[in-house]
């Protein structure tokens, strides 16, 4: 969250609401009935954590209100009734959800004006394009969204319920095979950090596995909060490989490369060339080193042989949805 015209968000925190497991555990600590974001994260040992956004769609409005309240009053320190608001939504956001968001902004927060933009479209704007296909992959959901002259093509949008959280879960599982144990919500956050710091995508998965068997060059160590040091090797690339092979976690779905290709194939034949040449990655789950090269290799194998394929991975892509929103909201034409 932040202000239109800024080049980076002022506040970045996980959309988590935590409630104390037992009342009275923290007597005299001025215990709150709910904690949001980083504070919920840091006190997770005594809290039950809830994620009000599931697969990119809000599923718990009371908790979502808490998150928005925290954003306005504690993070940005603004009076919401004094600022127009731009919110973003995942592409297949049900109409009822958009209406509910609008209602809460006007009735609970008294916003003077609001607009809801599609996340992937904002990422494309942030990359300086108006035509292209965006693969947007966050924590709970991934989408491929073809966009032509600034408009998302709804019939060709595909959703993949495979994203960061699933990769973290998979890493927890394969680290267990190594004899480490991670099970609680608190431990999941540690594994997420391991994933973000050490995982990468292999250009050739089978070959990488062979290399891992014979050499220890890819082994890295990671110090846990309690001081214990764990070693992670092939897990580093086995974890995000799931994006290309969802069957590894028992999902009957096409990988991100094939989903992108399928999305392009749902578009008019005349615009496919523009889409193949402008494949834009966005969201935290596209931050793995090696993802652009692998994506390019896989799509080249699927596309017509003469087709020019370009995969763009902007360095700021973790926040490109926000940056696109900042650009859009600061245009004078938009404000009218």
UniProtKB/Swiss-Prot annotation:
Q: Name one GO molecular function term.
A: hydrolase activity
The family database entries (InterPro entries) matched by this protein are listed as:
Actin, Actin/actin-like_CS, Actin_CS, ATPase_NBD
Q: Name one GO cellular component term.
A: cytoplasm
Q: What is its EC number?
A: 3.6.4.-
Q: What is its main location?
A: cytoplasm
Q: Where in the cell is it found?
A: Cytoplasm, Cytoskeleton
Q: What class of enzyme is it?
A: hydrolase
**Reaction(s) this enzyme catalyzes, per UniProt:** ATP + H2O = ADP + phosphate + H(+)
Query: Any idea what job this protein has?
Result: Actins are highly conserved proteins that are involved in various types of cell motility and are ubiquitously expressed in all eukaryotic cells. Essential component of cell cytoskeleton; plays an important role in cytoplasmic streaming, cell shape determination, cell division, organelle movement and extension growth.
Q: Which family does it belong to?
A: Belongs to the actin family.
Can you say what this protein is called? Actin-93
Species assigned in the record: Nicotiana tabacum
């Amino acid at each position: 969250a932040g202000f239109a015209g800024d080049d980076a968000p002022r506040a970045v925190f996980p959309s988590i609401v935590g409630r104390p497991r037992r009342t009275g555990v923290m007597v005299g600590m001025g215990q709150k009935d709910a904690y949001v974001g980083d504070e919920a994260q840091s006190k997770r040992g005594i809290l039950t954590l809830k994620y009000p956004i599931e697969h990119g769609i809000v599923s718990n409005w009371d908790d979502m209100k808490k998150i928005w309240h925290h954003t306005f009053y504690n993070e940005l320190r603004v009076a919401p009734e004094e600022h127009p608001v731009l919110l973003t939504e995942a592409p297949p956001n049900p109409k009822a959800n958009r209406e509910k968001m609008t209602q809460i902004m006007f009735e609970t927060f008294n916003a003077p004006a609001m607009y809801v933009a599609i996340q992937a479209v904002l990422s494309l704007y942030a990359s300086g394009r108006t035509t292209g296909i965006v693969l947007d992959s966050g924590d709970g959901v991934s989408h491929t969204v073809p966009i032509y002259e600034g408009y998302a093509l709804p019939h060709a949008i595909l959703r993949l319920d495979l994203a960061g959280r699933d990769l973290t879960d998979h890493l927890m599982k394969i680290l267990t095979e190594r004899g480490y144990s991670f099970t609680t919500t608190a431990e999941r956050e540690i594994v997420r950090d391991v994933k973000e710091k050490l995982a990468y995508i292999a250009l050739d998965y089978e070959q990488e596995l062979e290399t891992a068997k014979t050499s220890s060059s890819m082994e890295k160590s990671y110090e846990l909060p309690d001081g214990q040091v764990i070693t992670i090797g092939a897990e580093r690339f086995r974890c995000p490989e799931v994006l290309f092979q969802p069957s590894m976690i028992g999902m009957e779905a096409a990988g991100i490369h094939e989903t992108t290709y399928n999305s392009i194939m749902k578009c008019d034949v005349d615009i496919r060339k523009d889409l193949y040449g402008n494949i834009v990655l966005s969201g935290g789950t596209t931050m793995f080193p090696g993802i652009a090269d692998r994506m390019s290799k896989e799509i080249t194998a699927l596309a017509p042989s003469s087709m020019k394929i370009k995969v763009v991975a902007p360095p700021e892509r973790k926040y490109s949805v926000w940056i696109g929103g900042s650009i859009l909201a600061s245009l004078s034409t938009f404000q009218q």
